[in-house]
Regions:
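Active-site nucleotide/adenylate-binding loops and adjacent lid/helix of ATP-dependent enzymes
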Residues: 8-91, 101, 142
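Short glycine-enriched loops at secondary-structure junctions
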Residues: 7-10, 113, 119, 165-170
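Short, solvent-exposed loop/turn elements at beta->coil junctions and helix N-caps
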Residues: 38, 94-97, 163-165
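Generic beta-strand structural signal
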Residues: 33, 108-109, 166
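Conserved metal-phosphate-binding beta-hairpin within the catalytic cores
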Residues: 152-174
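Phosphate-binding site of ATP-dependent enzymes
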Residues: 65-152
Length: 174
């Protein structure tokens, strides 16, 4: 184990990570949590589409699903209601970011960004290497370094992979 227990706990849970990033004024996609299917549907009715639904705990892009319309959302929510996992009852929704077909993975040690790569996907909105996205070296800009240092401090430091997206209007978001 490299990172402290609390850092591993926070970074392994999107809900906890999102709350700490928001608390520390770090730009992120708009994020909505619901703890029941009815509350998730209410959020979707208020916010609209497209959104992305993600598992609170998970990696490699598994079960990350774009919700482009009400029919898709209803089907996914219904499926999650009948599964046995209690974490499936936490509906973690994020706005769909208008971005190039890539994201940026920055590796930090403490508050220092040490390396970065673009993760490019030509056929999916998911940019996970495990799902076939192609890595490409990315030069670390001052903006990236500053944002990653703030994100690292917000979650307690350690050795982290900070994922950045290039929002066409807002700039970099975590």
């Amino acid at each position: 184990v490299i990172n402290k227990f609390n850092v591993s706990t926070i970074c392994g849970n999107k809900l906890l990570t999102s709350m700490l990033l928001k608390k520390n004024n770090i730009p992120t996609p708009k994020t909505y949590f619901s703890f029941s299917a009815d509350a998730a549907r209410e959020n979707l009715d208020k916010v609209g589409y497209p959104l992305v639904i993600k598992p609170v705990i998970g990696s490699w892009g598994r079960n990350v699903i774009p919700l482009k319309d009400k029919d898709t959302a209803d089907a996914i929510i219904e499926q999650r209601e009948i599964t046995d996992g209690p974490l499936d009852r936490i509906f973690y929704l994020q706005e769909m970011i208008d971005r190039p077909p890539r994201d940026i993975r920055v590796i930090t040690i403490g508050d220092k960004a040490v390396t970065a790569m673009y993760r490019k996907s030509s056929d999916s909105f998911k940019t996970n290497i495990a799902l076939g996205a192609e890595p490409e070296i990315c030069d670390i800009t001052n903006e990236m370094e500053d944002l990653c240092a703030k994100a690292s401090k917000a979650v307690g430091g350690g050795i982290l992979g900070v994922d950045l997206m290039e929002d066409k209007e807002k700039g970099l978001v975590v």
